Amino acid sequence: TEYKAGDIMSGENVSHVWLSLGPCNDGSVVILHSSPSGVHISGTPTPKGIENSQAIDLANKYMDKYYPVWNKKYPVKPFDYLEKYSQFRWYDNVLYDKYNLKNMYADNVMKIIFEEK
C-alpha cells in the first residue's frame, strides 16, 4: 500500500482511525491519531517490522519539541498501523491540496504544518 499525507485509514477489525502525515524513505509512516490518553503524532515501524524507523524518530522529534510534557507522559509507541486498514484518499477535484502535501515525504509535511523553514 502506498501512503500519502492526508490519507484516512480505518481499522478493519478494530475501531480505530488515523490520518497519514506522510511516508518516510524507509517505508514507515508518520501518523496523527487519538487514543484514550489523547491525540498523538506517532510513527509506524517499517513494512518489515523494524521499530527503529524514520517515522518514529520524526514523531518523537516533533512531540518533544512542541508537546514535551505530553510526550513524556505518553511517549510515542511503535504500533503497526500498516496492515488491516482500509484507505480513503481525497483527490484534487474534491479537496484542493494547496501545498501538494500528498506528494511530499513526512519530514517536509511536518515543516509546513509547524511553519518551519
Each predicted region: which residue ranges?
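...with weaker cross-activation on analogous glycine-rich loops/strands in unrelated enzymes
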Residues: 1-48
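Low-complexity, Gly/Ser/Thr/Pro-rich intrinsically disordered linker/tail segments
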Residues: 46-117
